[in-house]
Structures are given as structure tokens and as C-alpha cells.
Amino acid sequence: MNHIKLIDCPIDVTYAINLISDPSCGASSIFIGTTRDSFQGKKVVSLAYEAYENMALKEMDKICSDLRATWPDLKHILIYHRLGTVPENEASVVIAASAPHRSAALKAVTFAIDQLKSRVPIWKKELYEGNHDAEWKENSESIRPKKSLSSFNYSVCKVDESRVVSRNLVQIRANDCELKNRVECFFKRKRAEINSCNVIDFKQSNLSSNINSDTEVDVSCARTQSTISKQEQSNCHLKVRRATNRCGPQQMQFRPKYKHELSRLTTSRVSTNEVGESLQNSRLHSIETYMGLTSKNNENIINRIKNVENRILLLESTSPEYQHFFEQSCMDQPEKKIKTNKTYSAHELRVYIHRKNKECP
């Protein structure tokens, strides 16, 4: 039988010995841990123990299971640990085991105290006499991972500013101000989409009896004028929509290759009538057309190339992939009016047939 307990009062050693005693056992081994009176020249008054009780009891039970798996002959196992303040020379932990032979009992108690120190979440604080501050004692036998004390010191690493990093290795070339502006624009667009969705969910309902359906109301209240209808096969009253991010880091794998896409768009948008007389003018004119620039063929070609470069840098700093691959949000599309067919009763149909019979003699 396993006897496991965390107690906040003095441990009765005699009672513990009686618990593990059994007529079939010829050996009983017991370990008693007490509070010593000094540590590194300082007078120890008492020890204070704290524990995560639920986890500690589970670990102690696992230790008992490991003991029985290793030494099946064990009859009784006892693990008592005291919490709170433990004065000098009083027992803080008692571990005992009984078995038919002494070898199993002695080895089991040794194994149990080692595992208790390394696995069970119990913390010890030493209280000293005089003006010495109390100290929490680190368990050097614990198998739990410890935080690395040797953190990386960035000040030791010297930055070699003489080396010029190639611009091809830099993915984002915008400065901090431009990055902040992009993030703010992204937040504004998402906020506008959410507001548009809220307007659709909580728009003015024509089902209200006190409001004329022919009158359009710009301002409405969602708490008093919205109509809640439970969706089929759902516990929610509002319609749940699946969010589809048409742009962003999650869609990187679905994005086409920009070089091939740029080539395709360039060739598809350029008309054969706009090709200049020379090959150089025609190719430069195609790039200018795609970039949205207007120039004359007789203009200086150096100035035209410079304008194209400035345009490319501008588009590169404002994320050009959104120009061609961003799909229009469904929120921007006008809402389609739902046409409902009128339902006629049997009486109305008879009246209608009777009137038609009179009109057609």
C-alpha cells in the first residue's frame, strides 16, 4: 500500500513505522530528513517549505509506481513531506519501505529520496539568525530545464560598417517612417472592412411595424432595430462568415511569380499600333505604358529611362504586388435586392379566374 501525504504539522515517525509494518516483511527501511543548525557559517533557525501540492502528489505517486516496477516485492511505501516552517532538528521528510528482504527495502528508500529531490516541485527557504537575509535554496539535483544564465551579449559583437551589403540581399528597403505608414494604412483598411460588415449585419430593418418601408434611414440602432434569426444547424444567432485573406503572408505560396506575371501583363497590354519605329523606342514605350508614364519618342532617351527608374522605385516602396493581384472585396459590391414572389390564396385565385371569364365571353 502507498502512503503519500503533504502535511503542515510535525511528522510522527512512530506512526509512520507502524504504517509500513507487516508480518510478511522481514525488513523495514526508513529515511528521516531533518533541519540542520548551520550553513556556511550562518546559524539556521528554521526551514520554510512550499509546494505545488497537486503536482507534487502526482509526482510522489509516480515515484511509488516506479519503485514497485523496479522492486515488485515491496509491501508498503510511505512518503511524507512537511510544508510550512520546520524548526531546527525536526523532521521535514520521512520515506519508508517494507519488503521481505532488506536489499529491496534499502535500495527502494535510496531511490525514492533521490527521485523526490529531483522531480517533486517542493521549494525550500532557509531562515538565518541575526541580520542575514533568508535565501531560497536551488535544487542542484532537479531534472527540470533551467534558464540559460549565459545570455548572448550583443555588445561584444562588433559591426563591420566598412562592408557594403548588396541591395539584392535586402528584402525590405523602406525606412521606418514608410513601414509605419504601411502598417497604419493596413489597419485603416481592415477597420473599414469591419465597419462595412457591421453596417450589413445591423442595417435598418424593414420588418419594423412603426417604420415606413419606403423611407430610407441613414442612422439605426443595432440593439433596438436589428432582427435576430437563428441560423439552421447552428447555435449562433448571427451568420458566421469564413474570413479569406486575399493578401498577406499566408498567401505567399499562392502568389504567382511576379517576373512572369509582369511579362505576361506587359505583353498583353501593349498594342502593336503603339510600337515605335526603332526596337529601343518600342521596348521603352512598352515599359512607360505599363508604368503609366507618357512621353514622346523624340524626347531624350536618358531622361525617359530616369523617369522609368523613379517610377519603379516609387512602386517598389508602396508594395506593387497589390496593384494587380488584389481582388475587389465583396463588401465593395452593391447589395443585390432580393425579389420575392407574391403568394396568392385560393380565394384570390377564384376571384381572378371569375374576372377573366367575364372579360372573355
From Swiss-Prot:
Its main location: cytoplasm. It is an enzyme of class 2 (transferase). It catalyses: 2 [molybdopterin-synthase sulfur-carrier protein]-C-terminal-Gly-aminoethanethioate + cyclic pyranopterin phosphate + H2O = molybdopterin + 2 [molybdopterin-synthase sulfur-carrier protein]-C-terminal Gly-Gly + 2 H(+). It is found in: Cytoplasm. GO terms for cellular component: ATAC complex; cytosol; molybdopterin synthase complex; polytene chromosome. InterPro entries: MoaE_sf, MOCS2B_euk, Mopterin_biosynth_MoaE. Its EC number is 2.8.1.12. GO terms for molecular function: molybdopterin synthase activity. It comes from the Eukaryota. Pathway: Cofactor biosynthesis; molybdopterin biosynthesis. Substrate binds at residues 101-102, 117, 124-126. Disulfide bonds: none annotated. PANTHER family: MOLYBDOPTERIN SYNTHASE RELATED. This protein is produced by a bicistronic gene which also produces the small subunit (Mocs2A). Belongs to the MoaE family. MOCS2B subfamily. Catalytic subunit of the molybdopterin synthase complex, a complex that catalyzes the conversion of precursor Z into molybdopterin. Acts by mediating the incorporation of 2 sulfur atoms from thiocarboxylated Mocs2A into precursor Z to generate a dithiolene group. This is Molybdopterin synthase catalytic subunit. The lineage of its organism: Eukaryota, Metazoa, Ecdysozoa, Arthropoda, Hexapoda.
